[in-house]
Amino acid sequence: MATIKEIKEFLVTVKELESPIFLELEKDNRSGVQKEISKRKRAIQAELDENLRLESMLSYEKELYKQGLTLIAGIDEVGRGPLAGPVVAAAVILSKNCKIKGLNDSKKIPKKKHLEIFQAVQDQALSIGIGIIDNQVIDQVNIYEATKLAMQEAISQLSPQPEHLLIDAMKLDLPISQTSIIKGDANSLSIAAASIVAKVTRDELLKEYDQQFPGYDFATNAGYGTAKHLEGLTKLGVTPIHRTSFEPVKSLVLGKKES
């Protein structure tokens, strides 16, 4: 009779819930065996559910595949709302029908999984472009225009160039056909891939800024206006990476000039 450990190792090879192997093993009345059967069935169901989720997030891409298009770039940005740091956009072309387990809107991915999924996108993407527009340009042209500049920069880095763009809630003045999708990072795998690339890239930049400008908690808050960040602004003042067109930074700068 096989040991429970041997059965556990064997069950990993079973891929279907209807497999006759389960029926056979269910005759074994050892509680440990029954526990391993239940565990493996849950794992198979989770894999099926994940595959269905990923399939549903390929609906926009599949419509474009039907039109004979394969070089489809997902575009997304991170960093519109922070008081400090750049806005970062990413453009990602995935291979046809590419499914990356766990890939989702970056806001829905557990932080501990960010780097793992970022690496999976890096490994499986046909091409990746990243656009970074700093706080000075944001202050000059406004955050909406800066976001478009970041996206255009990211797209310009792609090789090969895309045949179609899937963009998260934005239209770009480019001679490439495009689809603007509301909540695109939750509805398109290509945009979700761009979302995690932009997120990890920006988070890593803010960790570097945290070393340069301690006291604002940039490594944790990514430049957003948390209590620790606002406390740092009050105690230490404005840094070269702060957006002086954003409140309360703007008022602090004006107050300093007036005094």
From Swiss-Prot:
Its main location: cytoplasm. One of its GO terms (molecular function) is RNA-DNA hybrid ribonuclease activity. The lineage of its organism: Bacteria, Bacillati, Bacillota, Bacilli, Lactobacillales. It comes from Streptococcus pneumoniae serotype 4 (strain ATCC BAA-334 / TIGR4). Belongs to the RNase HII family. One of its GO terms (biological process) is DNA replication, removal of RNA primer. A divalent metal cation binds at residues 76-77, 168. The gene is rnhB. It comes from the Bacteria. This is Ribonuclease HII. Gene3D superfamilies: Ribonuclease H-like superfamily/Ribonuclease H (3.30.420.10).
